[in-house]
C-alpha cells in the first residue's frame, strides 16, 4: 500500500486498484496544487503494474466525492499566466489518468463538483449512488470562472453540446437519475454496493464512446452547431447583459474545441481560465464565496447555542407555512404550527405538501421521504404540544399589540428556556419585548418571501437579548438552510432600510415622466434580477410600501415617498401580482404572455411617460441612494461589518453579485469618487443625495471598507 496526504492507493486481491481520496483534517475533499506530485506518482505506479485489472477512484468522506478545487489557489496567483499554468497542470493530470491502459471508474457518492467532476470525466466510466447528497455539476461560472481541467472539452463529447452548455453556463447540478438520463454516469446504485459495483465494472473492457441522442447528433453538425451557438449566445447576453464575462468565454471555448479539435480546446480553456481569474467580476464573486464560507462558521455571539429539539410557529399564512416547511425539510426538526383557524392550519399544511409533492413529481424526492418530512409538521388551534418547544417563531400580522400578546401567551404555555423569535419586518424588537417576563429570550428573526427560496435571514437582538438566545437563533437559521446576519434593532433593520431609498428613487423617476419599462430595464441591465418597480409588484405593493412611513419617522425626509403615487395605486386596489393588479398586467391563470406594463397606471398617478434621462442616469440615481444608506448603516452599527452588509444585500435583495455587494462596489469606485458623485446628484436633485459622514471621512483618509490586499472586511468600531 502506498499513502499520500490525500490520495491512497490500495490493491485488491482481484488486481483492481482503489485510489481513495481523503484530504486530512478537512470535512470536504478539495483539489490542491500540491496534490499533483502525489497523484502523478500513483498514476506512474499504476501504469507500470502489468497485472493491473482496473482502477477505481472513490472518496473516504461520508458525504462528498470531491467538492471542487481549492479556490485559494487562484487567490495566490499574481497574473493570468500563473492561473493559466494552474489550469494546464490540472489538464495534464486528468490526461494522465485518462491515458491509463485499463478501465478507470469514478465511484461517486455525495458532491462531485467542479474539479471533482472533471476528474470523474477523465475516468472512462462513472457510477454514482442514489443518495440525495449526490450531485454532479460544474459550478465555476458562479465564481466568474470556467472549468479549467478539461471540463469544457470532455463534457460536450460525453453528453452532447446542448446539455453541456446548459450545465456549464448555469452551473447546473444534476441529481443521480438526471445524470444517468443525460449520460453523465453509467449506473446508479445504493451506497452499500458502490465500491463493489465500480470494481466489477473496472474489470471489464473500456467502453466505446457513448452514442449521443439524435437531437445532440444533429446539433453537433455544422448547421445545427452554428444555429445552437447563435441562439445560446443571444440568450446568454439577454440574461447576463454582458456583466458576467465568464459566460461568453465558456461558449467560445466549447466552440473552439468542437470546431478546431480538442488540443486547441484545451489550450483555449486554460488561457480563458487564467484571464477570467484576473477579472474584477471573478474577484468579487470569489470574495462573496469566502465571505459566506466564513460567516457559516460563526455563531453570532460569544455564547454557545442551546441544543434544538423542536420548533413552534405562530401563524399559518404564507410566511408561517414557509418557516414550518424549511424547519421540517432542511433542519429536520419537528415543528408545530398554531393558527386561530382551521383554514390557516390547512393552508400551512397544504403549502408544505404542495412543495414536497412537486419534488416527488420531478423525481427529486421519493414518496416515502415526502411522507417522512410531512410527518414532522403538526398543527392545532391551541397551544397543545408547545410546552417543550425550544424556539417559537411568530409570523402573525404586523401589529405591535398582537405581537406583545403573542409573547405573553408563549411565556405562559412554554418551557422557561423557550425563545420567542418574531418575524417582524418593521416593528422594533425592544417594543415587542417591552412587557415580557423573559425579555432576554425575545429576538427578531426576519425571513424574506418566499421563505423556501430566499437564502437570507436577519437576526435582530434587542438591548436585553442574551448571547445564548442570539447563538441559538443563528443555529436554527443555519439548520433551515439560511444565511443569517446579525443586525441592530432599528427601523427597517438593514435590508429594508437600504432597499427603501432605492425603490423611492425609482418612483421619483416615474413621477418625473420616465416609463416603468425604462426604469426596470435600466436596473436589470445594471445586474439586479428584476427592476425596482417590478419588485414592488412581486412582493406586494401594500407590503412593500408599508414600511416607508416607519422609516420616514425614524430617519427623516430622505425616506419620504414621492407625491401621492403609491396612495393612488393602492386606492385602485392594486397590490401587485398577488391580486393580478399592479404596475404590470397579469394574464389569467394558466395563460402565458410577455410581461407588459399596465398603461392605466400613468393616468392614476397623473404622469405622461416621456422622460429624458438615460438608463445609466436612472440606475445611478437608484443605486447611489442604496449605497449611501448602506454606508450609513455600517457607520451606525446596524450591520457588524462590510462583509455582513455585502452578504445581506446580495442574498436579501439581489444586489448584483458580480459587484460583490454594496461595500465592495464602493471600494471599487473609491470613497472620493462616491462623495463626488453624490454631491453632484444632491446639487441637481436634492439633499437626499448628500454623502453620509462615513463616506466623507473615508474620502479624506483614503480608507476602504474591505482591508486592502485581502478578503477581510473592516469591522465597525
UniProtKB/Swiss-Prot annotation:
Domain of life the protein comes from: Bacteria
Cell location: Cytoplasm
Catalytic activity: a (3S)-3-hydroxyacyl-CoA = a (2E)-enoyl-CoA + H2O; a 4-saturated-(3S)-3-hydroxyacyl-CoA = a (3E)-enoyl-CoA + H2O; a (3S)-3-hydroxyacyl-CoA + NAD(+) = a 3-oxoacyl-CoA + NADH + H(+); (3S)-3-hydroxybutanoyl-CoA = (3R)-3-hydroxybutanoyl-CoA
Family matches, as Gene3D superfamilies: 1.10.1040.50, 2-enoyl-CoA Hydratase, Chain A, domain 1 (3.90.226.10), NAD(P)-binding Rossmann-like Domain (3.40.50.720)
A single cellular component GO annotation: cytoplasm
Biological function: Catalyzes the formation of a hydroxyacyl-CoA by addition of water on enoyl-CoA. Also exhibits 3-hydroxyacyl-CoA epimerase and 3-hydroxyacyl-CoA dehydrogenase activities.
The name this protein goes by in its record: Fatty acid oxidation complex subunit alpha
Lineage of source species: Bacteria, Pseudomonadati, Pseudomonadota, Gammaproteobacteria, Enterobacterales
